[in-house]
A protein has these predicted regions:
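Extended interaction regions within the primary functional domain
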Residues: 66-101, 195-207
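Beta-strand/loop substructures that line and gate deep hydrophobic ligand-binding cavities in soluble
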Residues: 84-173
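Domain-wide signal for the mature, well-folded portions of proteins, strongly enriched
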Residues: 32-37, 124-127, 149-151, 159, ...
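Short, surface-exposed, polar/charged, turn-prone segments marking secondary-structure boundaries
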Residues: 69-71, 78-81, 133-135, 171-177
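A conserved amphipathic terminal alpha-helix motif
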Residues: 161-208
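Short C-terminal domain-edge/linker segments immediately following a structured domain
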Residues: 42-43, 81-86, 137, 174-183
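Hydrophobic ligand-binding cavity/cleft-lining segments
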Residues: 1-78, 82
């Protein structure tokens, strides 16, 4: 059974655009701010990262989720094709921004190494994140997070007795709650690491 989770977040940092870009490009430092992340490994030969997350199910049994991602970085302008699409989707007002942006993507890797599953509750999923930094006229930096994950669970007894639609809805709701908590925790860590203004923070979770 495939389940999906989504989260969105926005924060305004007092730090300059260049310094903010360096901070958010530090992949391992940033992802380890996630309270559910137990390990990050860089597979140099493949130029990909392996995430391992661990959460507890309603019965306090550990569930291990493994993701393989590749990081990409690129600069953009709010006047180019990507920038216009981003502004239409995420910005209510373009006035605060000078048009300069940086995009950091964690792209799901489909052709990845085999992962040895040590427990039946270990699942290899797909995750993708887009972090967009926008330079404001006042020198501050707006940061937008968008994260999507997908896990394919094997349903065991007695859960297999439940209608799949109901079970899928319940699982995606729980997954979204976990993603909200993780995003909020990461942003709190960012706030403690670099000087922030009172943040404009929106965190949303939901199924695909």
């Amino acid at each position: 059974m495939e389940v999906f989770g989504k989260s969105k977040a926005h924060i305004v940092l007092d730090s300059r655009f260049h310094e903010s870009g360096i901070y958010f490009a530090d992949y391992e430092k940033l992802i380890m701010c996630n309270p559910y992340c137990s390990n990050v490994k860089y597979l140099k030969d493949l130029d990909i990262f392996q995430w391992i997350f661990q959460v507890a199910d309603p019965r306090s049994n550990p569930i291990i989720a493994v993701f393989f991602v590749r990081q990409h970085e690129e600069n953009f302008s709010l006047d180019d094709g990507y920038g216009k699409a981003f502004a239409d989707a995420r910005l209510k007002n373009r006035a605060p921004y000078n048009g300069k942006g940086k995009r950091i993507r964690w792209e799901a890797v489909h052709d990845h190494p085999e992962f040895e599953k040590t427990t039946p509750n270990t699942f290899v999923g797909k995750a993708s994140t887009e972090i967009c930094l926008l330079h404001q006229h006042d020198g501050k930096t707006s940061v937008y997070f968008d994260t999507d994950i997908c896990l394919d669970f094997e349903i065991s007894f007695p859960l297999s007795l439940m209608p799949e639609g109901i079970l899928k809805f319940m699982t995606e709701t729980i997954m979204s709650q976990i993603m909200q908590q993780a995003t909020e925790s990461m942003l709190c860590k960012v706030q403690s690491d670099i000087c922030c203004s009172v943040p404009e923070l929106i965190v949303e979770g939901g199924k695909k």
